[in-house]
Design a protein with these regions (language model features):
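N-terminal export/targeting leaders of redox proteins
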Residues: 1-28, 86, 119-120, 129, ...
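Extracytoplasmic electron-transfer domains, predominantly the class I c-type cytochrome c fold
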Residues: 40, 48-101, 180-181
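Acidic, Gly/Ser/Thr-rich repeat motifs that build Ca2+-stabilized beta-propeller blades
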Residues: 87-90, 95-260, 264-267, 316-319, ...
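Surface-exposed loop and turn segments in beta-propeller and other repeat-based domains
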Residues: 165-179, 229-244, 286-307, 351-381
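Conserved blade-ending motifs and adjacent loop-strand segments that build the rim/top face
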Residues: 311, 424-444
Length: 466
């Protein structure tokens, strides 16, 4: 399941705790609790998230308060009903102990070799760009450069030899929790119209509350400047939470723009209601208008842009290179991440059916299937926290031909799915420990590119002769 970025460095160091050496019994107990309750969000392996800042204190009492009460609006659940005071105190001790060991877990201590072997294919990581923070979206320009959107709100033009130029004119974003500047895609006719699309967490103030939502901005790229900016989509309603934005985009073969929107942490009200935009996949014309043949467009009580519903938080989306279908992957809670094909008017079941459980170990539902609700092509137990995905149809990777590659945020590897039609028949984990793998794309040059969070790398997967 996706790590909840709560803005407080408490969550960061929470992540670090899982790989501490058991120096005393209390650490062992706390570590077991971490693995049971925390690792599905915060990751299996220790990570020094250098962009996090302490907001709620570093003393034991302050940490215990954070663990006990959580930050629900930011996606951090409360644990006072699951862990007793002694266990919470031990977990706080583990966090404090982990601070002494942060440096040894930084990116530099990752595997020193940049060559990785798998069944049928060996690749070398070539560094294309670094120090990008959290590179979320990748889009390839006709001249060979790529546009990179980073969660902080910065946009870069990146060349093949680590050249990096900042692009001006991007949207104003709320870079809190899981929000920020997220995906970027080019219009299918970009060479003619220069249109670029950005998904992001838009922000507005209502009284003393700061609210946000998933929004799409279209703009023209002129050199290194964005012009003619227009917001073409805002998911309604805005929410006070800071997680589950979804935000992936893809164009299909007919030129429709598909957009994923998470349920913003309100699974009881949003994903099963077609009266709001949350927990949905939307289909739009390229200028934001609603297609006349969308499934609910004639229902006066429904949101016309909805194409499918019952989603939790889809953070991977692509067009199948052969069939043209839109595929997504989706974060489950504690277990139950999914791979789906988006179908017109379909209900994907969240939270009525689910293969996972809640973070505190309690069941969300006793159903994994129900008539009228879609089943995933595959699901993951435990959660891998899937993000970007890419089909391999390039002759540069004959050993992976036809495979589906998916980035894992939790386990920090590239998941390879061997496909027979729409069926996953085998899986393999690649690039182990490379980092939180946010995105993967196959470029027009036939090479695969991956983005890794913190300190923010983009690598080209260079095939090695075997």
């Amino acid at each position: 399941m996706l790590r909840y970025t709560i803005g407080a460095a408490f969550a960061v160091v929470f992540c670090l705790s899982s790989f501490l050496i058991d120096q005393k019994p209390v650490v062992k107990t706390a570590r077991e609790n971490y693995q049971t309750y925390c690792s599905s969000c915060h990751g299996e392996k220790v990570e020094a998230f250098v962009d996090r800042k302490w907001k709620h204190g570093t003393g034991k009492a302050e940490l215990m308060t954070s663990i006990s009460g959580g930050y629900p609006d930011l996606g951090m659940p409360t644990w006072k009903a699951t862990l007793n005071e002694k266990e919470i105190g031990e977990l706080a001790d583990l966090i404090l102990e982990s601070l002494k060991n942060v440096d040894q877990y930084k990116f530099a201590s990752k595997p020193t070799s940049n060559v990785f072997s798998s069944e049928g294919q060996t690749v070398k990581l070539d560094t294309i760009a670094k120090d990008l923070g959290s590179p979320w979206g990748l889009a390839f320009l006709p001249e060979g450069d790529m546009l990179v959107s980073t969660r902080s709100g910065d946009i870069y033009r990146v060349g093949q030899n680590q050249q990096k130029t900042k692009i001006s004119g991007g949207p104003t974003v709320l870079a809190e929790g899981q929000g920020g500047l997220l995906d970027v895609v080019l219009h299918p006719d970009f060479a003619k119209n220069q249109f670029v699309y950005f998904s992001y967490s838009a922000v507005k103030n209502e009284g003393d509350q700061k609210l946000s939502t998933t929004a799409i901005m279209r703009a023209k790229l002129a050199g290194n400047t964005l012009t003619d900016q227009k917001v073409i989509f805002e998911a309604m309603p805005y929410s006070k939470t800071r997680h589950h934005y979804g935000s992936r985009m893809a164009f299909d073969n007919k030129g429709y723009l598909f957009v994923s929107v998470g349920e913003r942490g309100n699974e009881k009200e949003n994903p099963q209601s077609i009266a709001n935009d949350l927990g949905k996949v939307h289909r739009l014309y390229d200028d934001g208008r609603i297609p006349e043949d969308n499934p609910f467009v004639k229902d006066k009580n429904a949101r016309g842009s909805i194409y499918s519903y019952g989603h939790r938080n889809p953070q991977g989306m692509l067009k199948h290179p052969v069939t043209g279908e839109i595929w997504t992957n989706e974060h489950g809670p504690r277990g139950g991440d999914e791979l789906n094909i988006v179908k017109k008017g379909a209900n994907y079941g969240w939270p009525i059916i689910c293969y996972g459980i809640n973070y505190d170990g309690k069941p969300i539902t006793n159903l994994t299937a129900k008539e009228g609700m879609e089943q995933p092509l595959t699901y993951w137990l435990p959660s891998i926290a899937p993000s970007g995905l890419a089909f391999v149809d390039s002759p540069k990777y004959p050993g992976w031909k036809g495979n589906l590659l998916i980035g894992s945020l939790r386990f920090q590897y590239l998941n390879r799915c061997v496909m027979e039609g729409n069926k996953v028949v085998k899986q393999e984990n690649l690039l182990k420990n490379v980092g939180r793998l946010r995105n993967i794309k196959q470029g027009p040059d036939g090479y695969l590119y991956v983005s890794v969070e913190e300190p923010g790398y983009i690598f080209r997967l260079q095939p090695v002769n075997q």
